[in-house]
């Protein structure tokens, strides 16, 4: 057994102490989130430019958003990658998928016609979809019991950092129009190749290595759809599916909608989106990573406050006209709220509530369902928002109420417990 594998095994006993090696692994695994969100926002920032260059209709724009990293392409990758990560190991998936991602990104960057743009977008979606559940399972499995929220939360910092870098580049390169968008995609191409090279030295998950040696019936796929596992699957799915529609709308469509509805320029849309992700980095780092492992009671407070802020964030679109001041209010409120009651907790619960041999499958399933439904939503949103954002804002507010209420009232008591302890408690519940 290598030192890395031994470290992964001992993490249960280490309490809240995080080693330098664990931080390094978290950074490399977290780059999946960086590349995921970065590709989503790069596509969003360049959407109007590609539409003008290629003469795309509103329907084509919706279809492009629907098949890519924000939606259906990612969903297909998550369904396949999550399951294969459980069957074949985490390392076999993250060892190759970033090469596929890089190929897709390069296709987008060099796109001179509609087929190139659509093929590249779909390939990127599939590749990043396969990487995310596998990488997150790896982080959850090597994290100390009392620092799991901190390390998984760090991947959310990476998820916010990707868009910030992408949006700042987009803002700086705005005078170059479409050439600037191409350069942004080339940046993601380089980051993917560097991350792939650095990941080659990562060890396999010690927990997966141990669990894969058994043939226990409780690890079979059908076990995921019964008993405690089914309850956990429904819980994480409801929380994430409804939240993700709102988050995905802001991530990919904010610059597009601002420009299309003449609420501001392309540069203004990019800058406002960037501000939201900067807020996310700050709140996740200073609040989520600090308090997520403290206690179940603390998690409830964090979630409750965050959920309310997010509902208000999209509720303003229902009662106020779509304008720059209203957009700023939405971005600030949602930026704070989603850092406390959003994807970070979904990621943590997805590691805590499922056994090792079903962990990637479960997260791939819920991640995939969420991205599929976001794809359906994305297809109709340009048409839905063409005459204003009131109806879309009302629906998004409703979705956030459902997600927030589910997370608050059905939140599991898992803070600070080892994965083995949680599994044992759920088996006897």
Model region roles, listed by residue range:
Residues 44-76:
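Extracellular/periplasmic helix-loop-helix junction of adjacent transmembrane segments
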Residues 76-112:
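Conserved MFS/SLC helix-loop-helix module at the cytosolic interface between two early adjacent transmembrane helices
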Residues 87-98, 293-307:
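Cytoplasmic membrane-interface "Motif A"-like loop-to-helix N-cap segments
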Residues 120-157:
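Cytoplasmic helix-loop-helix junction between adjacent transmembrane helices
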């Amino acid at each position: 057994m290598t030192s890395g594998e031994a470290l992964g095994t001992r993490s249960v006993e280490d309490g809240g102490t995080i080693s330098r090696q664990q931080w390094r692994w978290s950074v490399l695994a977290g780059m999946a989130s960086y590349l995921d969100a970065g590709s989503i926002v790069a596509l969003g920032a360049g959407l109007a430019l590609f539409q003008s260059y290629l003469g795309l209709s509103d329907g084509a724009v919706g279809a492009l958003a629907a098949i890519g990293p924000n939606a259906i392409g990612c969903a297909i990758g998550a369904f396949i990658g999550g399951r294969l990560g459980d069957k074949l190991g985490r390392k076999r998936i993250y060892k190759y998928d970033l090469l596929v991602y890089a190929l897709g990104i390069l296709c987008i960057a060099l796109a001179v016609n509609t087929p190139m743009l659509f093929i590249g977008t779909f390939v990127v979606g599939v590749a990043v979809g396969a990487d995310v559940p596998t990488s997150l399972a790896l982080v959850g499995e090597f994290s100390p019991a009392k620092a799991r929220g901190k390390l998984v939360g760090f991947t959310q910092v990476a998820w916010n950092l990707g868009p910030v870098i992408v949006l700042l580049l987009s803002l700086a390169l705005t005078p170059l129009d479409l050439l600037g968008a191409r350069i942004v995609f080339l940046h993601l191409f380089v980051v993917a190749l560097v991350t792939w090279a650095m990941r080659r030295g990562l060890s396999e998950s010690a927990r997966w290595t141990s669990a894969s040696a058994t043939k226990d019936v409780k690890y079979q796929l059908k076990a995921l759809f019964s008993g405690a596992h089914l309850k956990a699957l429904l819980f994480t799915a409801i929380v994430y599916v409804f939240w993700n529609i709102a988050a995905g709308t802001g991530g990919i469509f904010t610059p597009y909608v601002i420009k299309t509805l003449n609420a501001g320029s392309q540069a203004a849309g990019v800058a406002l989106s960037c501000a939201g992700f900067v807020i996310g980095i700050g709140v996740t780092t200073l609040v989520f990573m600090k308090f997520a492992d403290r206690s179940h009671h603390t998690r409830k407070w964090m979630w409750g406050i965050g959920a309310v802020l997010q509902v208000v964030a999209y509720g303003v679109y229902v009662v106020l006209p779509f304008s720059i001041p209203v957009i700023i209010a939405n971005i600030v409120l949602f930026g704070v709220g989603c850092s406390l009651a959003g994807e970070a907790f979904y990621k943590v619960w997805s590691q805590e509530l499922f056994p090792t041999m079903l962990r990637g499958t479960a997260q791939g399933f819920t991640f995939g369902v969420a991205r599929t439904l976001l794809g359906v939503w994305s297809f109709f949103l340009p048409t839905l928002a063409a005459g204003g954002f009131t109806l879309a804002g009302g629906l998004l507010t409703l979705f956030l109420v459902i997600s927030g209420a589910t997370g608050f009232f059905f939140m599991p008591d898992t803070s600070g417990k080892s994965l083995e302890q949680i599994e044992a408690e759920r088996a006897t519940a």
